From Swiss-Prot:
InterPro entries cross-referenced by the UniProt entry: UPF0231
Protein name: UPF0231 protein YacL
Family under the similarity heading: Belongs to the UPF0231 family.
Highest taxon of the lineage: Bacteria
NCBIfam families, per database record: PRK05248.1-1, PRK05248.1-3
Pfam families listed in its UniProt record: UPF0231 (PF06062)
Amino acid sequence: MDYEFLRDITGVVKVRMSMGHEVVGHWFNEEVKENLALLDEVEQAAHALKGSERSWQRAGHEYTLWMDAEEVMVRANQLEFAGDEMEEGMNYYDEESLSLCGVEDFLQVVAAYRNFVQQK
């Protein structure tokens, strides 16, 4: 999972992720927006889940982050619909709307993002 952190002309941090993980970048850009307290909450949840069968979820305005002890899923909230609403043969998966990755990989991106934000 490759990523890049940039600052726009106003100094706002933007995250770009490799193909297949774009929605993780959108989560940082739309939900985190340099809110390090949210990252603290996510890291604490990840540590609490380690070795357990439980899961944790944080719904945001545009994206929801879900994780268990091994995997993180970020999905666009617009994907919430009943299976009956899906047309025959249509797959709702869209790499811009859903992404899965390992917890350790995700926490590495969180740590790198935190370091980048603090370098102002």
